[in-house]
Amino acid sequence: MSVALGVSHTAGGTQFAVTARDAERVELCLFEGKREIRQAMQRRDGVHIAVAGVAPGQRYGYRAHGPWAPEQGLMFDSTKLLVDPYATRLDSRFQYDARLSLRGVDTALLVPKAIVPAPMDVAAPPPPVFTPGGLIYELNVRGFTQKHPAVPPQLRGTIRALAHPAIIAHFKKLGVNAIELMPIVAWIDERHLPPLGLRNAWGYNPVVPMAIDPGLAPGGLEELEDTVVDLRRAGIGVILDLVLNHTGESDLLGPTLSLRGLDNRCYARAPDGALVNHAGTGNILDASDSVVRAMMLGTLRHFARLGVDGFRFDLATILARSPGFDPRAPIFAEIANDPLLQDRILIAEPWDMGPEGYRLGQFPDGWLEWNDRYRDDVRRFWRGDGGTLGRLATRMTGSSDIFSGKCSRSVNFVASH
């Protein structure tokens, strides 16, 4: 793609670019307090572009104009303020509100604003600390230190708390080689939770893939970068659990927050206008589209530049569906051929909820895979089930029945989120 999507700094000013192929027009919305200034964007091959004389720290969003025809996959509503899919920082957390789903109701006061970032250094990331065969510790960032007495109160429940000496000492005592952070990018509660007085605590309902939830990193990306540096010094790598299979905009009754309002037919897999639900969340992203894959790859590069060792891909089979699972899907080659990503740790959750979605052992060379057969057979042996000794031996020696000749690809686990 010739135009860099998201925000980029040019000699002529700050450039904003967003894909909206079916939109009649798109507006850039700049915010000064509650005042909204709208600027028409120019269209170039389905990408809408605007240049404004604004500085880092400027708050912004988009409005897309076009037809409302859900049966055709078109869900435009210019009253909805839309968050930039390439945003790297937000001014607040997402809060579910029923008005986010109501057509014709303005949502400028209900959604976070993206923040124009300062230019980033583009130095190549250091090689991963973690090597396959090491011990991975999965954790929820907020819950892990929320009540830890040794962590200062202002740090508890944040990413920076993970680099506190008491936390690092705990990891070292356990022999941890890498921590795997459950989703840290900005997410929204599912609509059934607020009426019950509940919140989504785990974060598996993301809205935009590159912006860390402000509650976990009040100081922005630098807090993740600094934490990664501190943990690397202790010999501990960082792996991010990424949800690139769906967005928190849910089904046809869900909120319009970003991708749905900009380019639903591009981003969501929706043949004949019907949203596919192989993630059990109301929608899935369509990785057969090059625009969607570009966003996914941009997300991986973005976090790789911050020094993370690699990624665990939630419901990873969805990334290779077209509509069925394809072990030669374009996303695999694009990751393998990307200079920033070639040496990153790649871990697949090798299943989804769709037809023939269980694909353990079928990901390409270079990928590790969560091995639920190890989990089940070890648990059965511990429980005392008869006839399990042979299966236990197979699991303890690399699951050769699944990973023939590639036993080092198995990620063995007994418990997870």
Each predicted region: which residue ranges?
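Conserved alpha/beta catalytic core and glycan-binding cleft of carbohydrate-active enzymes
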Residues: A87, I115, I318, S322, ...
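Substrate-binding/active-site clefts of carbohydrate-active enzymes
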Residues: N140-G310, A316-I335
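The feature marks proteins involved in alpha-glucan
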Residues: M1-A11, E36, R43-G46, V54-E138, ...
